[in-house]
């Protein structure tokens, strides 16, 4: 089929007579031809609001502040859209009140960090003089080692892009010690369900449970399973409980490679289609709504594998009670292992039917987060066996011993060998029973 190329504002545009082909190519995300805009004059950081979202930690006479600009803010700060090249600048400031010089270890921030020259080169658009000015600007913007005693140094590390949340690990090395700071920061721009749920306004009053036995009773009395929107049919079992401050919970999840999920909209639908067709990762793909407390999940998280058809995902609901002033979330975890085709829904995910394997796998996963302080099990979920099998809404069969894994999170670092394995009686999990001679 004939086609012609037309120059439009210095950028080639390709026109095909067949509209259908254009739609297909747009759907699959195959850009016809691209043109990088010329570099524009950057705006000074103090004139952009991203530093208002900065977070600071202080210990051992060292203060570290980090901030991550959004896509729009990055465009303003650097005069070009680095996000289009999958580059995300992280601003770091170090105040050194010790008597020794400090070195920021760039690989701790991102083991595959991008050099300033590479970040600039990815956005070169000419003319040559503008490209050279861009190179020099990016070099000047980078964080410069060392941080001398009594001084403050700040600048950017160019990292690979994350959306929704970013885990930032800052290691500072002196002649005598290594100082570690870990942050989990929210990044504006990803269209997630979190933006539409105000957890602090869900309940007019909330009970604070203080006795362990009362907490156990509340968790055991919760519904066994999620439901459909009308509450007329049960779905996947509610098989996990998260207890802790929200910041500690999110830090643990992000550190272990979990990502918040986008809501369903046209852009996310196109991303999902590309992931399914080409077998690509889509770290933030939407998950379908399930219901508890009369509403869909307050928070969705997933850990993607090779493609959108293979992933672990979690749905969480904030409970109408707290435990010793800590949030309590009821949740559901399952593992998608493929896609099945149905007449009414066209396609749907197939879950690993042995849901306890996925539940217990989360224990091992989050143990490495260093935010998990304790784990136990409590009854209340749905028992499902080969003889008496239960199904989710798909309907997929699942098998379970009917226990919920209860995770306790802390802001304090907890090594693996210090995680408390809670032996809750009288119905402790069979896998945690002590050996009896």
Question: Model regions: which residues?
Answer:
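Short, hydrophobic/aromatic beta-strand segments
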Residues: 100-108, 168-170, 250-255
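The feature marks short-to-medium sequence segments in extracytoplasmic or secretory-pathway proteins
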Residues: 97-148, 153
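Surface-exposed edge beta-strand/loop patches
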Residues: 141-206
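Low-complexity, acidic Ser/Thr/Pro/Gly-rich terminal tails and inter-domain linkers that flank the onset
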Residues: 44-83
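C-terminal motif of bacterial Sec signal peptides marking the signal peptidase cleavage site
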Residues: 33-34
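A cross-kingdom signal targeting lumenal/periplasmic-facing segments of multi-pass membrane
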Residues: 88, 95, 266-435
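Short, solvent-exposed beta-strand/turn "edge" segments of beta-rich domains on protein surfaces
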Residues: 74-91, 97-101, 146-148, 230-231
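Terminal, regulation- and interaction-focused segments at domain boundaries
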Residues: 222-251
């Amino acid at each position: 089929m004939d086609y012609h190329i037309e120059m439009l504002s210095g950028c080639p545009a390709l026109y095909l007579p067949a509209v259908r082909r254009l739609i297909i190519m747009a759907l699959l995300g195959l850009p016809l031809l691209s043109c990088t805009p010329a570099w524009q004059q950057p705006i000074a950081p103090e004139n952009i609001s991203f530093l208002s979202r900065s977070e600071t930690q202080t210990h051992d006479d060292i203060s570290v502040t980090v901030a991550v600009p959004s896509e729009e803010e990055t465009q303003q700060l650097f005069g070009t859209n680095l996000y289009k090249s999958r580059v995300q600048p992280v601003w770091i400031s170090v105040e050194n009140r010790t008597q020794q010089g400090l070195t920021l270890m760039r690989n701790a921030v991102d083991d595959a960090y991008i050099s300033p020259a590479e970040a600039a080169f990815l956005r070169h658009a000419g003319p040559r003089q503008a490209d050279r000015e861009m190179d020099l600007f990016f070099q000047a913007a980078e964080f410069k080692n060392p941080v001398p005693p009594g001084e403050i140094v700040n600048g950017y590390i160019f990292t690979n892009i994350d959306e929704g949340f970013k885990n930032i690990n800052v290691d500072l090395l002196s002649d005598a010690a290594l100082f570690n700071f870990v942050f989990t920061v929210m990044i504006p721009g990803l269209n997630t369900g979190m933006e539409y749920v105000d957890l602090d306004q869900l309940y007019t009053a909330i009970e604070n449970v203080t006795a362990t036995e009362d907490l156990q009773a509340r968790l055991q009395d919760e519904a066994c399973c999620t439901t459909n929107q009308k509450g007329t049919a049960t779905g996947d079992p509610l098989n996990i409980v998260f207890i802790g401050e929200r910041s500690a919970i999110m830090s643990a999840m992000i550190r272990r490679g979990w990502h918040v999920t986008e809501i369903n909209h046209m852009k996310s639908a196109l991303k999902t289609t590309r992931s399914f067709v080409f077998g690509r990762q889509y770290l933030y793909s939407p998950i379908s709504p399930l219901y508890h407390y009369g509403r869909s999940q307050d928070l969705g998280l997933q850990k993607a594998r090779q493609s959108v058809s293979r992933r672990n995902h979690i749905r969480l609901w904030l409970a109408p009670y707290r435990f010793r002033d800590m949030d309590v979330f009821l949740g559901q975890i399952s593992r998608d292992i493929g896609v099945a085709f149905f007449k009414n829904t066209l396609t749907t995910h197939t879950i690993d039917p042995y849901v306890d394997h996925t539940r217990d796998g989360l224990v091992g996963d989050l143990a490495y987060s260093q935010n998990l302080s304790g784990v136990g099990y409590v009854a209340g979920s749905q028992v499902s066996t080969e003889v008496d099998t239960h199904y989710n809404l798909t309907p997929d069969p699942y098998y379970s011993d009917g226990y919920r894994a209860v995770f306790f999170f802390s802001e304090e670092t907890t090594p693996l060998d210090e995680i408390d394995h809670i032996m809750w009686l009288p119905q402790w999990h069979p896998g945690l029973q002590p050996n009896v001679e």
